[in-house]
């Protein structure tokens, strides 16, 4: 098995680490962010508008959920050049990661069987997917890496019997993947729901198999639950005591799903290396722009400034959104005459060219340019945050960054 990850620096505060994921197309410094796709494209962006993203940003690559291509396997097989070429992306520019389902939406539950996983296509129709079909799709899509076929339908308070079925089924799928000896890197799905002992056992079982990394799956959080998630109450014991200690340190850990900046930092502190852009996409869909503090320089000063600015806003506007420390809702008419960029210090295309007032107008008139501009800003802002995380780990100041988001 070819080694695809190395640790460059271990932080001093928790289990945070700086690493290099050695992709087929390019190497990526971790912690890293995958840009999530929907329906065969990066949401709201064409291959041309993708070029408006700052070239200095370091994304891990694109995450392509298979559920949007479940009807296209024969087409992709006939095309023969891989999913990135099919999407019209610049050759060899993007690492490609395939996951069975879209981690950024609320998929329907209750339809899996012992032999297959139910996926929902772009039209909302159910498609049963067994291992052979998923494996055929992977051969046609030619990804750099993929998440093993898995049953992650184990929400909080689900029956222990359901958890056991999910873990057994997922391990069986994983063994089938390993037998096929694909050229792509495989992230073995680690299931177990919210059951501490099952998580521990499953982590050990997956770690015994020759996989290239691990995907922490099976929390079954809705998007609204994910935004409200309290890591200390909901996940800390599961992740820090049951999962991470039972996975080998030298292999990368992946978590897919909506993550606020606070949750990202807590996952990083636990030793998780890769994430996806579901949170940025969710905020874009809601007409919100990310504004949380995301740069290395003057973090304390910036934190003070945002508190002062927020207090001033609250004094002048009794309807101030308490989440403005993280986002601003540009649907709100108080931005109708706000001619500032989304964030003064941001150098993304949107902030260099446009104002809050203009985006408020676009949202009010339901103009399709609104989600384009918000996507460009939110992806830029979110990835800049990851650059801040990487720098703080390198400089052994990660604990200070974490404190700012408590």
Model-derived features with residue positions:
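Structural signal for well-ordered, non-membrane alpha-helices
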Residues: 171-178, 244, 387-390
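Short, solvent-exposed loop/turn segments at secondary-structure junctions
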Residues: 35-36, 68-70, 103-104, 153-154, ...
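Conserved, mostly hydrophobic/aromatic
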Residues: 26, 138, 188, 206, ...
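C-terminal extensions of enzymes
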Residues: 1-22, 28-37, 44, 140, ...
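Glycine- and acidic
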Residues: 155-160, 164, 213-222, 368-371
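Glycine-rich phosphate/ribose-binding loops and adjacent secondary-structure elements
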Residues: 168, 180-342, 346
């Amino acid at each position: 098995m070819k080694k695809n990850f190395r640790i460059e620096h271990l932080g001093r505060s928790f289990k945070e680490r700086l690493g290099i994921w050695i992709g087929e197309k390019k190497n990526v410094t971790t912690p890293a962010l995958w840009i999530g796709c929907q329906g065969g494209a990066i949401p709201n962006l064409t291959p041309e508008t993708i070029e408006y993203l700052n070239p200095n940003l370091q994304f891990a690559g694109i995450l392509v959920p298979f559920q949007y291509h479940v009807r296209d396997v024969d087409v992709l097989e006939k095309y023969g050049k891989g999913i990135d070429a099919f999407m019209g992306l610049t050759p060899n520019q993007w690492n490609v990661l395939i996951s069975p389902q879209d981690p950024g939406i609320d998929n329907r539950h209750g339809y899996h069987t012992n032999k297959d996983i139910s996926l929902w296509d772009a039209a909302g129709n159910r498609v049963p997917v067994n291992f052979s079909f998923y494996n055929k799709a992977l051969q046609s899509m030619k990804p750099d890496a993929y998440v093993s076929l898995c049953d992650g339908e184990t929400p909080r308070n689900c029956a222990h019997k359901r958890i056991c079925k999910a873990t057994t089924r997922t391990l069986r799928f994983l063994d089938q993947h390993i037998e096929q000896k694909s050229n792509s890197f495989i992230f073995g799905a680690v299931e177990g729901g919210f059951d501490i002992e099952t998580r521990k056992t499953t982590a050990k079982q997956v770690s015994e198999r020759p996989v290239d990394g691990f995907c922490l799956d099976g929390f079954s959080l809705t998007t609204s639950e994910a935004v409200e998630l309290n890591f200390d109450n909901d996940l800390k014991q599961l992740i820090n005591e049951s999962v991470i200690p039972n996975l080998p340190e030298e292999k990368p850990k992946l978590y897919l799903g909506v993550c606020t900046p606070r949750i990202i930092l807590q996952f990083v502190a636990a030793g998780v290396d890769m994430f996806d852009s579901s949170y940025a996409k969710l905020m874009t869909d809601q007409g919100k722009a990310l504004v949380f503090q995301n740069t290395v320089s003057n973090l304390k000063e910036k934190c003070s400034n945002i508190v002062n600015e927020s207090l001033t806003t609250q004094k002048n506007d009794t309807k101030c959104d308490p989440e403005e420390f993280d986002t601003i809702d540009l649907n709100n008419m108080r931005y109708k005459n706000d001619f500032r960029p989304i964030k003064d210090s941001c150098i993304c295309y949107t902030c260099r060219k446009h104002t809050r007032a203009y985006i408020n107008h676009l949202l009010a008139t339901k103009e399709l340019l609104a989600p384009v501009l918000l996507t460009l800003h939110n992806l830029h802002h979110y990835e800049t945050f990851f650059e801040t995380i990487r720098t703080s780990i390198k400089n052994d100041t990660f604990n200070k960054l974490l404190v700012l988001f408590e």
